[in-house]
């Protein structure tokens, strides 16, 4: 039976992924949600915690897939780079700024980076997420209807309100969809 682990985005909680978990369960997947305090630690630290979470789970008998929303997708990039053997299925990211985040850079340039972004900026939102290891399948879904902080931060172009569509691509990506 296929398994999926869901990761939330910045300033969210694992429960934010519960409606998506219900939909996946209805399609026959077993689903877990992984929660992490997005601004308290760095992405490599979150990836290490995800590895401990995966090691304590019972995921034998089928591929292990991952879905990450926004920052959760960057945690998955760090996880896949450090533990490629643990990714037996695919990674799908939803609105993840794979090549850095202009919104995060604008927040940081206003002097609000530490209180609002914490450890999430370095190694990820700054565009320094690790490359995908060979053999890891990653697909990205981007939004194109602006809702959120984008206008206040002066984002222009196709975006979901926080992440520009162009930021949701990365080298080695298998597929990219814009909704």
For each of these PLM feature ranges, what is it?
Residues 4-10, 15, 19, 23-38, ...:
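Serine-dependent carboxylesterase/thioesterase catalytic core
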Residues 133-179:
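C-terminal catalytic-base region of ester-bond hydrolases, centering on the histidine
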């Amino acid at each position: 039976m296929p398994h999926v682990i869901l990761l939330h985005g910045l300033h969210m909680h694992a429960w934010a992924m519960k409606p998506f978990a219900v939909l996946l369960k209805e399609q026959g997947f077993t689903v877990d949600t992984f929660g992490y305090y997005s601004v308290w630690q760095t992405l490599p630290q979150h990836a290490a915690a995800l590895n401990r979470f995966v090691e304590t789970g019972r995921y034998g008998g089928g591929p292990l897939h991952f879905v990450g929303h926004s920052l959760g997708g960057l945690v998955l990039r760090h996880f896949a780079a450090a533990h490629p053997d643990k990714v037996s299925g695919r990674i799908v990211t939803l609105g993840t700024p794979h090549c850095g985040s202009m919104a995060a850079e604008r927040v940081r340039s206003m002097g609000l980076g530490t209180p609002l972004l914490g450890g999430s900026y370095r190694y990820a939102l700054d565009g320094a997420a690790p490359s995908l290891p060979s053999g890891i399948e990653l697909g990205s879904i981007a939004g194109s209807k602006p809702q959120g902080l984008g206008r206040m931060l002066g984002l222009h172009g196709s975006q979901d309100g926080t992440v520009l569509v162009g930021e949701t691509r990365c080298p080695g990506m298998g597929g990219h969809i814009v909704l």
